[in-house]
Amino acid sequence: DCPSDWSSYDQYCYRVFKRIQTWEDAERFCSEQANDGHLVSIESAGEADFVTQLVSENIRSEKHYVWIGLRVQGKGQQCSSEWSDGSSVHYDNLQENKTRKCYGLEKRAEFRTWSNVYCGHEYPFVCKFXR
């Protein structure tokens, strides 16, 4: 089972953190919460719906984005997008922008679309680990 304050879906535990951090700091924070903790990866439409609901229930502020664990890695033609937990992107809901390398759920779209945002901005975030 998941610890108290965490929500479960499938084989994973999730928690929205309202503290605002950069993508890197949020990923580091998630890794400190559990052995295989990371910013959330979203690997199916069902999981996307679950995460959207969780974020909507927890984030009431005017912050425009909530970090997820997706970041464009590498330079130029060698770019690949992968989740911070190492899983590859099979399910996606991306809005592209070449200069912004990290992804967040966009409040304006009710946290349903993934928009790329400058990684140094500070936003709330969602952590995930396998239970």
UniProtKB/Swiss-Prot annotation:
Q: What is its main location?
A: secreted
PROSITE patterns in the record, alphabetically? C_TYPE_LECTIN_1, C_TYPE_LECTIN_2
Instruction: Note the InterPro entries from the entry.
Output: C-type_lectin-like, C-type_lectin-like/link_sf, C-type_lectin/snaclec_domain, C-type_lectin_CS, CTDL_fold
Q: Where in the cell is it found?
A: Secreted
Q: Output the Gene Ontology terms for molecular function.
A: toxin activity
Which organs or tissues contain this protein?
A: Expressed by the venom gland.
Q: Name one Pfam family in it.
A: Lectin_C
UniProt keyword list: Disulfide bond, Hemostasis impairing toxin, Platelet aggregation activating toxin, Secreted, Toxin
Task: Kindly list the cysteine pairs connected by disulfide bridges.
Answer: C2-C13, C30-C127, C102-C119
| Domain (C-type lectin): residue spans on this chain | 1-131
The record's annotation in SUPFAM superfamilies points to: C-type lectin-like
- This protein's GO CC annotations: extracellular region
What does the subunit comment say?
Heterotetramer of the subunits alpha, alpha', beta and beta'; disulfide-linked.
Role, per record: Potent platelet activator that aggregates platelets via both GPIbalpha (GP1BA) and GPVI (GP6). Induces a tyrosine phosphorylation profile in platelets that resembles this produced by collagen, involving the time dependent tyrosine phosphorylation of Fc receptor gamma chain (FCGR1A), phospholipase Cgamma2 (PLCG2), and LAT.
Can you tell me which family this protein belongs to?
Belongs to the snaclec family.
Protein name, per record: Snaclec alboaggregin-A subunit alpha
Q: Which organism is this protein's natural source?
A: Trimeresurus albolabris
